[in-house]
Regions:
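Extended, histidine- and acidic-residue-enriched regions that form the cofactor-binding/catalytic faces
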Residues: 1-84, 88-104, 112-288
């Protein structure tokens, strides 16, 4: 259920139907190679969330396109907000969800760079002693693993993935064997968008820029250091992937269907959970 499509007079019923669970997709507007749109993180994550919500009803708050992308302004179209503003937007958004009756809020993260930001925000809610819970769910937690899919196929259960042709399966074997770089604009992200919005993907440009790591300062990471340039210096084209020109809509729909089901199961888990709510209530009592 999209928040913006619910009539005001039906809102209380929507809260009841969702068991007080509201979901907000948090992404980023940035380059993902030359073959994917700038809004990739929200586009594919929101598509998954909306399909999952049809299986396991939750209310979906307007998406937050603006994520952590400091220092990447050289790519046209990138949108960069200050960290303070993003934290304020998250706080105000969650406050409004709670005011409207939602006591369980799931922030579905579609951008790897948001992970620390969202985890920090979730803990910051405790400082205000709010009576609602914030859960952070990284969207890629629900993605299938190609090696797991191939094991299922090799066990004689090819029917589990009815859309895949023999050529698709062989391509996935080839990619799994030869893949060295992934994580941004890669086979998985591209497949999700091919499954949802193939009109937004230009596979003729998938190899236009290099997606391999430069390992520019990887020696510092290996020594235990974090620097704000780790990822940017390793992937200066804002693309982290080996070539995956064999990717297609069939593979995309197959991966998408699995991900939607896993995401729906995650929503169900939070709807049915009572332990976190009980812990929060006990904790709030101790703070008085």
């Amino acid at each position: 259920m999209l928040w913006t499509e619910i009539m005001s007079g039906q809102f209380e019923k929507a809260v009841e139907r969702s068991k007080g669970v509201c979901v907000m997709v948090v992404g980023c507007v940035e380059q993902h190679g030359h073959h994917l749109p700038l809004g990739q993180d929200v586009i594919h994550t929101a598509g998954i969330v909306e399909l999952a919500a049809k299986k396991e009803p939750v209310v979906i708050f307007p998406h937050m396109y603006f994520g952590e992308k400091q220092g990447a302004g050289e790519f046209p179209g990138t949108i960069i907000f200050s960290t303070r503003l993003m934290l304020d937007i998250l706080a105000e958004s969650c406050s409004e969800m709670a005011r409207n009756g939602f006591k369980k809020i799931i922030l579905v993260n579609g951008h790897g760079g948001n992970t620390n930001l969202l985890n920090t925000f979730a803990r910051s809610v405790l400082h205000e002693k709010n009576d609602y819970l914030v859960f952070v769910y990284n969207s890629w937690s629900a993605w299938p693993r190609i090696n797991q899919m191939l094991k299922i196929i090799d066990s004689g259960n090819k029917k589990a993935f009815p859309e895949l042709t023999d050529e698709d399966i062989e391509y996935l074997r080839y990619y799994l064997k030869n893949n060295k770089n992934s994580g941004h604009g890669d086979i998985m992200e591209t497949a999700m968008t091919l499954g949802l919005r193939p009109d937004l993907v230009d596979m003729s440009k998938v190899n236009e820029v290099d997606g391999t790591s430069t390992h520019y300062i990887s020696h510092l990471a290996k020594a235990g250091f974090y620097t704000p340039f780790d990822w940017m210096s390793s992937y200066p084209n804002s693309y982290a992937s080996d070539a995956h020109e064999g990717n297609n809509e069939r593979i995309g729909r197959t991966l998408l269907n699995y991900t939607v089901q896993r995401t729906a199961e995650a929503f169900k888990m939070i709807k049915e959970d009572t332990l976190c709510e009980a812990y929060l209530n006990t904790w709030l009592e101790k703070q008085k």
